[in-house]
Amino acid sequence: MLSLREQQLQVWFKNRRAKLARERRLQQQPQRVPGQRGRGARAAPLVPAASASAPQRGPSGILPAAEPTICSLHQAWGGPGCRAQKGIPAALSPGPGPIPAPIPGPAQIPGPLPGSIPGPIPGPAQIPSPIPAPIPGPISGPVQIPGPFRGPIPGPISGPAPIPGPISGPFSGPNPGPIPGPNPGPIPGPISGPIPGPISVPIPGPIPGPISGPISGPNPGPIPGPIPGPISGPNPGPIPGPISGPNPGLIPGPIPGPISGPGPIIGPIPSPAQIPGPGRLQGPGPILSPGRMRSPGSLPGLAPILGPGSGPGSGSVPAPIPGPGSLPAPAPLWPQSPDASDFLPDTQLFPHFTELLLPLDPLEGSSVSTMTSQYQEGDDSMGKKHSGSQPQEEGGSVNENHSGPRLLLDL
């Protein structure tokens, strides 16, 4: 008694033989040519189709037995899985041949290309892997290149080609045009060559080398090196260091610090402060005129109070007075007229006095109180000449408590 597996194999072979016999009959039937009728149509030659691909029969006229394997019922009736496992030839199919029609869709190249591509690629090409060889021809369409290039590209690229990553290598050629975008960060390296154009942005750090061109904007920081050219803009901050070289031109602004080097002062010198009060002279010391008297050498113990000078302005710091020993001959301060001699003293009668009275308004007051002042006597001849006209002397001092007109009348 046969088992179930053997029965299934017998049924499968029976069906297979019947199918092959039916296909053979269809292939052996003559193909009727249109236009021929009657017995001439049967005389046409037979055209066997795929007769070489038919399975060869064994010596006994039956098909060779297959290897005994376990298959299910639906696989035994011609299932594709069982046919692939048993090695049974599948349905008849045409042999391999060339495909004349081109592929209409985009070409996808999965692996690297061993050789160069001679012709251009008309459609968009997607190249996922790097290309070991250079591309000799131009690429007409847009190219998306995700990976890096191992070799250089000799030909030009006509279409736009975006570069996703940064460029690590330096540029060998010159840069013909300026960079259109702003520079967000500082320049890390030094600039070896000169800068041809003006710099619109402020420079945060010091500049070690000299600057050949003018600077248009303000300079926030100090400049350690020499500046050969003029500075067109204003300088907001003072110059911290001394000026070593000569200054050929004028300085338009005020100088905050002292000037150490010698040089002429072009601007006006401010005059000392005026003595307050409408017409009275206040203070314990003698009254001097800075434009007339040059030195308080004969007044050792008293601090002089300077009167209004002849300068155009007024300041709070008086001009320096040279030391003793270089006193020129005193010049007359007032005109020698009969009207002025009644109110003003004659300086020729008092050559040893180093204190002088300022001209006052006669209508404002006639009494002038002066303090005691010391003076040094000259030679005996000058003392004898004016001994009859001097008032009372006590220890080299002169006490004048008279009024101005009375003193002049006594003289």
Curated annotation (Swiss-Prot):
<comment type="similarity">
    <text>Belongs to the paired homeobox family.</text>
</comment>
<dbReference type="GO" id="GO:0000981">
    <property type="term" value="F:DNA-binding transcription factor activity, RNA polymerase II-specific"/>
</dbReference>
<feature type="compositionally biased region" description="Low complexity">
    <location>
        <begin position="295"/>
        <end position="307"/>
    </location>
</feature>
<keyword id="KW-0804">Transcription</keyword>
<comment type="function">
    <text>Transcription factor expressed after fertilization required for zygotic genome activation (ZGA), a critical event in early embryonic development during which the developmental control passes from maternally provided mRNAs to the expression of the zygotic genome after fertilization. Binds and activates expression of key ZGA marker genes, such as NANOGNB, ZSCAN4, DUXB, KLF5 and DPPA3. Binds to regulatory DNA sequences containing a 5'-TAATCC-3' sequence motif.</text>
</comment>
<feature type="region of interest" description="Disordered">
    <location>
        <begin position="88"/>
        <end position="246"/>
    </location>
</feature>
<dbReference type="InterPro" id="IPR001356">
    <property type="entry name" value="HD"/>
</dbReference>
<keyword id="KW-0805">Transcription regulation</keyword>
<dbReference type="GO" id="GO:0000785">
    <property type="term" value="C:chromatin"/>
</dbReference>
<feature type="region of interest" description="Disordered">
    <location>
        <begin position="286"/>
        <end position="340"/>
    </location>
</feature>
<feature type="compositionally biased region" description="Pro residues">
    <location>
        <begin position="149"/>
        <end position="246"/>
    </location>
</feature>
<feature type="DNA-binding region" description="Homeobox">
    <location>
        <begin position="3"/>
        <end position="24"/>
    </location>
</feature>
<feature type="compositionally biased region" description="Pro residues">
    <location>
        <begin position="319"/>
        <end position="335"/>
    </location>
</feature>
<feature type="region of interest" description="Disordered">
    <location>
        <begin position="363"/>
        <end position="411"/>
    </location>
</feature>
<dbReference type="InterPro" id="IPR009057">
    <property type="entry name" value="Homeodomain-like_sf"/>
</dbReference>
<dbReference type="GO" id="GO:0003677">
    <property type="term" value="F:DNA binding"/>
</dbReference>
<keyword id="KW-0539">Nucleus</keyword>
<keyword id="KW-0217">Developmental protein</keyword>
<feature type="compositionally biased region" description="Pro residues">
    <location>
        <begin position="95"/>
        <end position="139"/>
    </location>
</feature>
<dbReference type="GO" id="GO:0160021">
    <property type="term" value="P:maternal-to-zygotic transition of gene expression"/>
</dbReference>
<feature type="compositionally biased region" description="Polar residues">
    <location>
        <begin position="366"/>
        <end position="376"/>
    </location>
</feature>
<dbReference type="GO" id="GO:0005654">
    <property type="term" value="C:nucleoplasm"/>
</dbReference>
<keyword id="KW-0238">DNA-binding</keyword>
<feature type="region of interest" description="Disordered">
    <location>
        <begin position="20"/>
        <end position="63"/>
    </location>
</feature>
<protein>
    <recommendedName>
        <fullName>Tetra-peptide repeat homeobox protein 1</fullName>
    </recommendedName>
</protein>
<feature type="compositionally biased region" description="Low complexity">
    <location>
        <begin position="27"/>
        <end position="55"/>
    </location>
</feature>
<keyword id="KW-0371">Homeobox</keyword>
<feature type="compositionally biased region" description="Polar residues">
    <location>
        <begin position="388"/>
        <end position="402"/>
    </location>
</feature>
